[in-house]
């Protein structure tokens, strides 16, 4: 599939400098691009590549001023990175997710309702009383349990598992191996030291435009719902326990674990390997740095938390400075103690 530079510029709302009729067939990094490629320049440290790239066209910011001659055509836009990401999304939609129709063998219960325009891969399973929207792509070996609801335009990649009663909004992406709706980790200790399983009869709800990474696991609620709200993005290998609530447009990076009934606000950022205790809350716009532990509720919005247990970023930085100086401070303290305890000379 090919497009002209002018066609790309019109899609992005940009202006062209150079040959607007040149044809584009693929996307590439600016340092590796060859003829027929489209690339972008968002980080100024990559500017030297602009003067040597083989790309046919490069997306740049509106106010960028080249310091040397540029062979490639330029498309000027307000935000090069955002514009390039839109093109990547379009490319993915027309290549990876362009599948349509039904592959055999696959299973669909007679009571299931499946909208048109979608795709069902071989060995996929759709259970009783499911309602699947328009243009939903269900890749091979995906499992959609009984009574699930999936909104229009959602993608369920190969091997993903949606337990019964899971609700997924529109335009969501559930990557390979993700499991939504498995039992929460609920066990009641018994007098003899054993544990009695507590039935988990709730479900999982994803609102619109949520992304779930590969092999992420989101447990169903004990009662009610485990909820991921609109626009939030969950990375690979994240564990969300029963009754967790994640706010709107929050991002959670890989290997993070959130214990039961924790509540995360809107526009939060949890970096990799964060741990969060159960029944605590994070205020909106909280950032938790990598490998930090959150053990208590944070009520103030906009804080950056660091450390285990996590506390205010600036306080933690000061504490780290003192920590690194502990050997020196210990020596000084011993010297002071020795001087104080030494007998006075007559």
What residues fall within each predicted segment?
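Terminal amphipathic alpha-helical/low-complexity segments used for targeting or macromolecular assembly
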Residues: 1-105, 171, 177-178, 183-196, ...
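Structural signal for interior beta-strand "rungs" in well-ordered beta-sheet cores
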Residues: 40, 101-312
């Amino acid at each position: 599939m090919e497009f002209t530079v002018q066609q790309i510029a019109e899609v992005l709302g940009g202006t062209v400098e150079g040959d607007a009729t040149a044809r584009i067939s693929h996307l590439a990094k600016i340092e590796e691009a060859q003829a027929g490629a489209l690339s972008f320049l968002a980080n100024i440290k990559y500017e030297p590549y602009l003067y040597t790239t083989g790309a046919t066209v490069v997306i740049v910011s509106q106010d960028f001023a080249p310091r040397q001659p540029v062979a490639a055509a330029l498309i000027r836009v307000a935000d090069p990175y955002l514009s390039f990401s839109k093109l990547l999304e379009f490319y993915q939609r027309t290549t990876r997710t362009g599948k349509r129709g039904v592959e055999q063998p696959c299973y669909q219960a007679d009571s299931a309702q499946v909208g048109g325009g979608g795709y069902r891969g071989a060995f996929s399973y759709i259970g009783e009383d499911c309602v699947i929207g328009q243009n939903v792509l269900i890749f091979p070996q995906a499992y959609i349990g009984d009574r699930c609801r999936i909104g229009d335009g959602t993608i369920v990649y190969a091997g993903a598992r949606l337990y019964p009663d899971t609700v997924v909004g529109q335009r969501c992406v559930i990557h390979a191996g993700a499991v939504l709706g498995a039992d929460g980790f609920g066990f009641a200790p018994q007098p003899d030291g054993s544990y009695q399983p507590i039935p988990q009869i709730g479900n999982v709800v994803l609102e619109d435009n949520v992304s779930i990474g590969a092999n992420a696991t989101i447990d169903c609620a004990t009662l009610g719902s485990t909820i991921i709200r609109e626009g939030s993005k969950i990375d690979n290998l994240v564990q969300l326990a029963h009754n967790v609530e994640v706010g709107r447009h929050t991002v959670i990076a890989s290997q993070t674990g959130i214990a039961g009934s924790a509540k995360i606000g809107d526009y939060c950022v949890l970096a990799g390997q964060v741990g969060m205790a159960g029944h605590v809350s994070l205020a909106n716009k909280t950032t938790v740095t990598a490998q930090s532990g959150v053990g208590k509720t944070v009520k103030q919005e906009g804080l950056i938390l660091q450390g285990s247990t996590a506390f205010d970023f600036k306080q933690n930085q000061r504490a780290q400075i003192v920590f690194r100086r502990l050997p020196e401070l210990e020596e000084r303290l011993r010297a002071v103690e020795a001087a104080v305890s030494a007998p006075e000379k007559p």
